[in-house]
């Protein structure tokens, strides 16, 4: 019984430890998501501002080489935004995987807690039965001693 409890406690400890690492990875992923969102917002605002400036300069006529530089810069901005969106998608997928693993580990930990509580209750019942047996044997012994003394008094 004790070995089972110890084994289940060890398994629970291992699950709690791995769950802790999953939570740490989730925190890292969330900080990465926040960082990428901030970068994406900066890129988008910069792109909008740059497009406004380009629109104003187009109204006043820009030379062809200068316009090509603007288009190249806008293309780089769009490429950067797309890369940031791709990393966001990857981070969200990782986040969902780790959330799934975390939920799975939580269920396991609940199961180990349940098994440990059952074993503890079973152990408590066994100790109560042992105490009751000891008490019964003690009462029986006293009764037998009492009867034995009564028998010797008459002889």
Curated annotation (Swiss-Prot):
Organism the protein comes from: Buchnera aphidicola subsp. Baizongia pistaciae (strain Bp)
Q: Where in the cell is it found?
A: Cell membrane
Record GO cellular component, one term:
plasma membrane
Can you name this protein? Flagellar FliJ protein
Signal peptide start-end: none
Q: Where are the transmembrane segments?
A: none
What UniProt keywords are attached to this protein's entry? Bacterial flagellum biogenesis, Bacterial flagellum protein export, Cell membrane, Chemotaxis, Membrane, Protein transport, Transport
Per the record, the GO terms for biological process are: bacterial-type flagellum organization; chemotaxis; protein transport
Domain of life of the organism in this record? Bacteria
Chief place of localization: membrane
UniProt xrefs under InterPro entries: Flag_assembly_chemotaxis_eff (IPR053716)
Membership in a protein family: Belongs to the FliJ family.
Bilayer topology reads: Peripheral membrane protein
Protein task: Flagellar protein that affects chemotactic events.
